[in-house]
């Protein structure tokens, strides 16, 4: 209890200090825009399988009352946005979980020079329950890019997360910290000719001993070169070292590919590709030979569709069986605007690695993910959406031999009968199926209805549609 009170006290002091700074700047600079807006939100949530179990499912109703504040500070090359949302949650069946929770977020956009852009975000919650069904996450992130010369750019980022969530491998809930740092440099030496180097470092540390904890670093390089206006090549090489906290079976992986590109139009290329992967570990080496054919369709600045088909030839130096498997390559994101009122967003990806991010200890992993979301403006103040997604994870090593399938379907309505009043209704259905004994199948239905009172539009910018925001909504 003492730590919780200390955390709440720290949040109040931190928030008050930031607000004082915001208002101080607003008087100091005539061009500064500062805004403080209170909001009131009442939410009712129903879940027919709160603990996501196969048997003995638990229904739960949760009523939330939130009084939040948002503040914006805009001045020349600096934009800051602060959100503070205290909330009281009332559980119908799990009475011991009733209580207040506090959420604080701080977003910043900085342009320290003409050639440098930096974005930062902090998100903190006082929620610290460590019980099944509860999830929370505290994050801090910074992303930046600097243009060194007319043709050379440097990108850099750091992401930190401390969370309590459900583990893919076992279905149990665990607390862990994730640190991820990346840096990359790219040089463009022709209209479509590029080359670059990247490096990433990642640490996933569990509070209690866990087989999925790891440390990883990954240098890589790439080049794309068009020999003629219609014929080109691209290639990439990478090294990946994964060091497990609870195992001596660490993995070193060397990968590389080369593609022949044939341009059919300004936005459409076909390709022939060969990729090779070689992994070393104490339990046995692994070779993957992967020829494929496909196409790249650049549909816009931030959207593209890349599809291919090939065969994975796997050779193992252990008890795992060699295999020849058909594999569909997929990397797609596109928004189709079919009318002034409606749009369809699609996303999809596939891949394979010797140790995945979400269940590293399960070893060699193949995955497919695809989803879509349909948005439609039914009336001026009434909008709707429908979404669906499918995820498949395969862990084919002989001592694991596991396949997980997740189907998610849902939709929602948003109605603003008055400028200061918003009503939202959403529904989501999740079906999880697995062939492992480590965790059970489950289905879950969740309904959320909320009423929000907001006196005016905040200066907080409306987030632009992005692939990451779409996938966060339809996959999670």
Short names for language-model regions:
Residues 1-8:
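N-terminal secretory signal peptides that target proteins for export/translocation
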Residues 8-9, 16:
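Generic short amphipathic/hydrophobic targeting helices enriched at N-termini
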Residues 14-25:
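Bacterial N-terminal signal peptides
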Residues 29-476:
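Gram-negative and organellar
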């Amino acid at each position: 209890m003492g730590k919780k009170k200390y955390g709440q006290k720290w949040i109040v002091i931190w928030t008050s200090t930031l607000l004082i700074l915001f208002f101080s700047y607003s008087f100091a600079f005539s061009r500064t825009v500062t805004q403080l807006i209170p909001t009131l939100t009442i939410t009712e949530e129903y879940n027919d399988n709160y603990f996501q179990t196969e048997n003995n499912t638990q229904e739960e109703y949760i009523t939330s009352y939130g009084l939040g504040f948002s503040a914006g500070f805009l001045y020349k090359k600096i934009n800051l946005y602060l959100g503070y949302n205290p909330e009281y949650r009332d559980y119908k069946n799990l009475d011991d979980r009733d209580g207040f929770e506090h959420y604080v977020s701080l977003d910043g956009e900085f342009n320290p020079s003409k050639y440098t852009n930096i974005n930062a975000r902090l998100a903190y919650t006082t929620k610290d329950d460590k019980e099944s069904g509860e999830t929370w996450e505290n994050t801090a992130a910074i992303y930046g890019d600097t243009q060194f010369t007319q043709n050379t750019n440097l990108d850099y980022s750091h992401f930190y997360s401390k969370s309590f969530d459900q583990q893919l491998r076992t279905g149990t809930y665990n607390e862990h910290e994730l640190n991820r740092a990346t840096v990359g440099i790219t040089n463009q030496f022709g209209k479509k000719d590029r080359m670059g180097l990247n490096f990433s470092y990642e640490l996933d540390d569990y509070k209690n001993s866990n087989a999925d904890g790891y440390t990883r670093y990954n240098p890589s390089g790439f080049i794309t070169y068009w020999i003629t206006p219609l014929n080109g090549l691209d290639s990439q090489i990478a090294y990946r070292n994964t060091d497990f906290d609870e195992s001596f079976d660490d993995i070193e992986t060397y990968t590389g590919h080369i593609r022949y590109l044939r341009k059919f139009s300004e936005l459409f290329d076909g390709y022939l590709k060969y990729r090779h992967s070689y992994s070393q570990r104490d339990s046995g080496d692994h070779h993957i030979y992967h020829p494929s054919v496909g196409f790249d369709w650049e549909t816009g600045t931030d959207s593209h569709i890349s599809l291919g088909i090939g065969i994975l030839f796997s050779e193992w130096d252990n008890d795992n069986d060699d295999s020849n498997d058909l594999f569909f390559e997929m990397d797609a994101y596109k928004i189709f605007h079919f009318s002034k009122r409606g749009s369809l967003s699609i996303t999809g990806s596939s891949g394979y690695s010797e140790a995945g991010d979400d269940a590293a200890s399960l070893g060699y992993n193949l995955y497919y993910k695809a989803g879509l979301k349909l948005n439609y403006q039914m009336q001026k103040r009434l909008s709707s959406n429908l979404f669906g997604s499918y995820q498949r994870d395969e862990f084919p090593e002989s001592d694991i031999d596991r396949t997980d399938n997740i189907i998610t379907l849902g939709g929602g309505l948003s109605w603003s009968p008055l400028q200061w009043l918003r009503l939202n209704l959403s529904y989501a259905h999740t079906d999880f199926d697995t062939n492992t004994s480590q965790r059970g199948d489950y289905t879950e239905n969740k309904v959320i209805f909320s009423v929000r009172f907001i006196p005016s539009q905040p200066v907080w910018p409306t987030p632009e549609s992005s692939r990451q925001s779409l996938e966060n909504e339809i996959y999670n």
